Amino acid sequence: MVDPGREYPCSLASTLKLARRLRGMKQAHAAELLGVTQPTISRIERGELKPVGILRIRLMDLVSARIHPARDAALRRLVEGSASPVHLVCDVTHRLLAASRQREREWCRAAAELHGRPLWRFASDAIRAAEERLSSLGWGEHGGTHALTFTTGANGSNELRIVPGIQIWERMLLSDGSPARLVTSADEVEVL
């Protein structure tokens, strides 16, 4: 069942450190962008400080993936033009970046209504369980897994419907180095 109050399933400590590394950003620059001190950034990255309120909102915005209109245009076209049910989200915040028409039909919603909004609150129990496994699989780490296949059930939501079946998650980096997740629904025949 959908739990709208559930928090994003990411570790802001490791996410901030990874986002800074991928973008070549020093702690001092991140601190300046977030309106805090460099030691505060260091404490967040060590897990000693859990950001709340406006700092958390700014931090989520800083680490979120965004499709660049020119450099990521081909990827967006491939996703939106796909004949398969597929969508692309920020791997950190689960904000929708792009979706195919087939996915929109499954959801019974237009992607334009959801663009930039986090989809996490619509996650099925199986999707939540798969998300919890990612860190143990080395998701996003050098030498770790960058793809996961699992079976999901429905989410029980009329607001955004998840169809039971096989899902394939594939992690990729956008042109700015931010992590995105390609989510594809597949038939068993396709997966084998």
Residue ranges and their predicted role:
Residues 21, 32, 61, 105:
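Short polybasic/polar patches that bind polyanions
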Residues 1-21:
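A short, Lys/Arg-rich alpha-helix, primarily the initiator
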Residues 24-42:
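Short alpha-helical DNA-recognition segment
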Residues 68-85:
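Short, basic/aromatic recognition patches
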Residues 50-72:
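DNA major-groove recognition helix of helix-turn-helix/homeodomain DNA-binding modules
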Residues 83-192:
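Sensory/regulatory domains in signal-transduction proteins
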